[in-house]
């Protein structure tokens, strides 16, 4: 997850339960980044990660590495960025590098640059994604970059998804939407409830949110909830850019009112698999237990 949907408590609880909690550091003030990392450290002694969107926030790299996270999570590098140099700086600090890719070409680039883990992200996911389905991109990448470990991302929310990713050759999964719908996630209650109530069909790939923020993501669309606000601005992105300040002010009022249908909510199709808001640690343990039971059952049927 990126900035705004994570905090130190969420990352700490995920790691403490046996996952890898990741703090989103992009577009976050330096002092807040340090605070989130320290909050996670107060909860757990287990490894944590910090995520940077390289196209926009490479300048934060030194600050993040000074805090000595066990894992540097990266994504969305520009073509002109030196991934090998960035990854080498992380390795020199003692961190492992986990890089997310939406295409096979980017997977090869990350592997050549020295990534320790590659996250193959499918278009099913929430937030900024590529255009290849999760099933295909995960299998493509696991075959192409072996023996580099691969995680699947986009559309995963339960133990069955984890078992499926393992069957595709991945070593695990990265979850975004599932952890937004947790007690610790620092988003409004209406946002979490919208995920729980979603059937997975009410999302859309769009550039509306980027037109509003003014950020140009390299080769990405954003999957968001198809709210009335999004419907209103689909196809009107140039006007939205011109009226950015005015519309931002209205959205801030929406947050205060808790009006989900006049907001932007980044979540993926896995929302259709989520039916409750739970503690993050409970989510981690439940997914692991479900996957173990599924794989145990499959082994027994094969005997």
Predicted regions, residues:
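Conserved active-site-proximal phosphate/metal-binding subdomains
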Residues: 131-151, 157-303
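Active-site entrance/lid segments in N-terminal catalytic domains of soluble metabolic enzymes
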Residues: 1-149
């Amino acid at each position: 997850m990126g900035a705004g949907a994570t905090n130190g408590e969420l990352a700490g609880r995920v790691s403490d339960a046996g996952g890898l909690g990741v703090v989103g550091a992009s577009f976050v003030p330096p002092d807040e980044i340090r605070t989130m990392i320290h909050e996670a450290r107060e909860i757990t002694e287990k490894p944590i990660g910090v995520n940077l969107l390289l196209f926009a926030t490479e300048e934060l790299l030194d600050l993040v590495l000074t805090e000595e996270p066990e894992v540097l999570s990266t994504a969305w590098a520009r073509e002109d960025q030196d991934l090998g140099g960035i990854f080498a700086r992380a390795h020199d600090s003692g961190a492992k590098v986990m890089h997310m890719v939406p295409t096979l070409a980017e997977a090869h680039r990350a592997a050549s640059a020295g990534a320790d883990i590659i996250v193959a992200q499918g278009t099913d996911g929430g937030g900024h994604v590529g255009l290849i389905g999760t099933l295909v991109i995960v299998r493509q990448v696991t075959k192409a970059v072996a023996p580099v470990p691969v995680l699947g991302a986009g559309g995963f929310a339960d133990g069955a998804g984890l078992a499926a990713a393992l069957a595709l050759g991945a070593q695990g999964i990265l979850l975004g939407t599932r952890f937004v719908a947790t007690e610790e996630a620092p988003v409004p209650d209406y946002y979490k409830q919208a995920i729980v109530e979603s059937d997975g069909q009410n999302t859309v790939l769009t550039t509306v949110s980027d037109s509003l923020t003014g950020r140009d993501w390299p080769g990405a669309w954003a999957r968001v909830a198809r709210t009335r606000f999004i419907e209103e601005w689909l196809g009107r992105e140039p006007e939205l850019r011109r009226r950015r300040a005015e519309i931002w002010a209205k959205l801030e009022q929406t947050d205060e009112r808790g009006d989900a249908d006049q907001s932007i909510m980044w979540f993926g199709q896995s929302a259709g698999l989520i039916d409750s808001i739970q503690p993050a640690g409970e989510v981690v343990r439940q997914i692991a237990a479900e996957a173990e039971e599924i794989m145990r059952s499959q082994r027994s049927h094969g005997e």
